[in-house]
Each structure stands twice: as C-alpha cells, then as structure tokens.
Amino acid sequence: MGKPTGFMEYKREVSVAEDPKKRIQHFNEFHEHLPKEKQRLQGARCMECGVPFCQSGMMICGMASGCPLHNLVPEWNDLVYTGNWQQAYNRLKKTNNFPEFTSRVCPALCEAACTCGLNGDPVSTKENEYAIIENAYSEGYAAAKPPVVRTGKKVAVIGSGPSGLAAADLLNQRGHQVTVSERSDRVGGLLMYGIPNMKLEKQIIDRKIAIMKKEGVTFVTGTDIGKDIKASKLLHDFDRVVLACGASNPRDINAPGRDARGIYFAVDFLKANTKSLLDSNFEDKKYVETKGKNVVIIGGGDTGNDCVGTSIRHGAKSVTQIEMMPKAPDKRAENNPWPEWPKVCKTDYGQEEAIAVYGQDPRIYESTVKEFIKDKNGSLKAVKIVKLSWEKDPATGRMKMQEIAGSEQILDAEIVLIAAGFLGSQKYITDAFGVELNERTNVKTAPGKYQTSVENVFVTGDMHRGQSLVVWAIREGREAAHAVDESLMGYSNLVIQ
C-alpha cells in the first residue's frame, strides 16, 4: 500500500462530461479525462483492504457485488499510484481481455462494492482502468503478442460480441487456430451495433481487432452460420465450435395497433444509426429519422437510455421513456446495505440530455402501453398508456402488477422504440446445431459448464446466461475458453481469474 492515508488526503475526482447541450451536437465520446498525474493520485485512495469486496464478484440477493472478472483492483490501483503503469497494465490484462471496453461501458460494480464508499466516496477504479489501458496504447506495450507455439487444433467461434471475442482471444493465446464468424458487416457484435458511438467509439473496437488479427485470429464478416454455412460443415471443418451469438431476439409489446408504421425495436434503431454514421456520416439517410417527431421509448434500462440520447441528437421534438417499475429511492434503503448493488435512482447521460433540452426528466414510471393509435393511413400518431400498481402476491411472494382503472393517458408519438429486453437467441441458430434449450430459451448446459447437449459444441455469453452486462460476457468467454481448451488438450493452463 503506497499511501495508507491516501483516501483521507485526496478527494475522489473523475472525468468531466461535456455540457449536455454541446455534446448532443455530435456522436463522439464526451468525457475529458484527468491528466496522468491527477489520475495517479486517485490510485492512492485505494485502501488495499484485507477483504477487497471490489474484486469479489459474488452474488448477493440476485445481484453482483464487485467485479465478475475478479480484477486485481487493489494491486493495479497501487501500481498506478507508484507510477508503475506497465506493471499495472500487466496485472489488469491478467483477468480482463478488454479493459478498453469495460472502462467505457461497465457500470462499475467494483466501485459500488468499494470499502472506501461505505462512509465516503469510492475509489475511481473505472477511471483508473481507463487510464491504464489508454496509457498502454500510447506507450506501445499493448502491442500484438502472437503465440509462440500452435497446437494444430481449430476452433470456430460464432459471434464477435464481447463473449465471443474473449473466448477467441484466450483460445488463440493458448495456440489454437481460431476463426470468428460474424453475420454483420463489422466485427464487434453488441459492442459495435448495440452500444452507441458516444458511449464506445468504434475505432476503439477496430484498434483491438487489428491487434487480434496480428496475433493470428481470423475474422469472417457477412457470414450467417446456420443460413450461409451449415452447422454440419463447421463441425466437420473444426475441432470445436463455440456459440456466442448473444441474446438477440427482442421482446415485443403485444398491444392493439402494434402493426402501425413507426414502431421499431431499439436494437434495430441503434444498429441502423451506428451503421449510417460509420458508412456515410448519416449522408445515406439509412437510419430512423426522429427530427421534429415525438418519440416514445418503451423500457427504462440502458438500451432505452441510449435511444433517448440518440433521438435527441437527431433533433426529436419530444422524448418520453416508459418504465414499468416504480422509481427507485434516491438513497440506499436500509434493506439494501453495502456491499449489495445499490438500488437507487440514477440519471444516465441520455436522461440528463433530455432534462437539458426539454426541461424535464423523460421517464414515466409504473406505466405500460395499452394501445398504439394509428391515423387513417396506418401510421402511428399516439400511444395510450396506463398506470400500474405493484403488490406482493401472498401465494408466491412475487410482486404482481395491476392496471389502475381510469389512469389512461394519451401521448403524441410518431416514433415508438421498443427497448423491453431480449428473449434468448435467434431460433434458427439453435435449431441449426440442435442444441437443447432451457426454460428461459437460453442454451442449456450443466450448472457452471459450457458444453452443450451436442458433442464438441460449446456456448458462452448472453446465449448461455441470458441478457447481461459486457463484463459478465467477458467472464463467460474466458471460462468457455478454459472448457474448450480442456476438452481439446485433456487439461488447460489458461488462467481465467
């Protein structure tokens, strides 16, 4: 511990976000990060606890407390403070294949479990992670390191999201020849087309993919396995197959008027927006235009928030976000103690921008869609919503929602974006391989395992555990790589945590 009194001497400092009214003029990342010396002092705030909950990654009451990757947080925080940036990078990379992604899009489970945050402000671990990886790139020691020896084994990874990339990266490091297939035109999966550019600039993904290519990973884009190439051919050509196709089947809203023109799934809306941005800087007009339109977003999660920010950047007349659940408390409740994940109300970047532009929070809580209202031409013109009440079912103990009679409200809407989550993977890919599914329509495996019901076929990521965070996807990819390696070699020397 380089500075035992650091948490008392230095206040928490984090990057500064650009003013909302300025940042909505562009689609770039909008945080100004601390200078290197100031960031170094933030490392001194880490207490190097005897029991570092920040890296525990344990489940408490169904939620993760601490980093699921078990990042060696106290170690590299101290190395940042002492100026050993390269060693900090080495320790960070030991558990995390892609700190350039997690330092941008992770909700920082580590900080929520930080002991320093129990009676004060937590260590700015996410910002330290960002500084470590970006310094590694600028100093040149994040360069490609191809494996010295090849095993002669071939592995196909289907899907290039965070889980597929993590599995591919580790399997390639082990010496296996890895080919990653991606059905889209660009590598990255969720990272590329599911997360807007202002949260994760796509050049960051391209930068890492270029390194993986130099290390020997082969990427094939525009290829839809199960349609363009049969599963049987893949199983013939490769020793093992890893399914990493994500949970890409969006949950729909079954309400009258659903066939109205102007209703889109959020995933399609965000993909079209990013693709148009990258292809032509929006000149091709191949995105959903929200300029001058009333936009209603169904869903209160991260994807819904991304839709808020994207719609505002295109000049929406109004943006409303519908959330089924009650508003969370502003402060942690007594029955939600540290180190549990704090169930408190958070205002994300898109909602901040809506407040700045429209003068009010876009969220309407405890509500659901009752009807999509069409004009005479079949286009959407309004949405009818109704308020909900939540009560505990005495028989099951679960919360049960009920519509409140007479609480209907009409919202003007020419565009509706459905961000209501996902219901497993696309059926054609699971059918193509004949893998067994569980009751949640995820690919079934034994608990804690990654081998599917089909010989030589493994699964990882959201396709395995259901819709989740990027950090969980990376952990799944690492563990799946270990399982694949063990099945190929009879043992595995991959260090996954």
Annotated model-derived regions:
Residues P4, H31-C61, W85-L109:
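Immediate flanking context of iron-sulfur cluster ligation sites
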Residues P4, R12-E37, Q42-R45, I373, ...:
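C-terminal catalytic lobe of FAD-dependent flavoproteins
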Residues G304-C307, H314, T460-L494:
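A conserved FAD-binding loop/helix module that cradles the flavin
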Residues T5-E32, L41-A44, P68-T82, Y89-L92, ...:
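Beta1-alpha1 glycine-rich phosphate/pyrophosphate-binding loop at the start
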Residues R261-G292, E391-Q467:
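FAD-site-proximal beta/loop scaffold in flavoenzymes
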Residues A131-V149, R207-K227, P250-H314, L437-S453:
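Glycine-rich dinucleotide-binding loop and its adjacent helix/turn
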Residues Q87, V149, K154-I158, D206-A255, ...:
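Feature captures the FAD/FMN-dependent oxidoreductase FAD-binding
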Residues G159-P162, G299-G301, D462:
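Glycine-rich Rossmann-fold phosphate-binding loop(s) that bind the pyrophosphate
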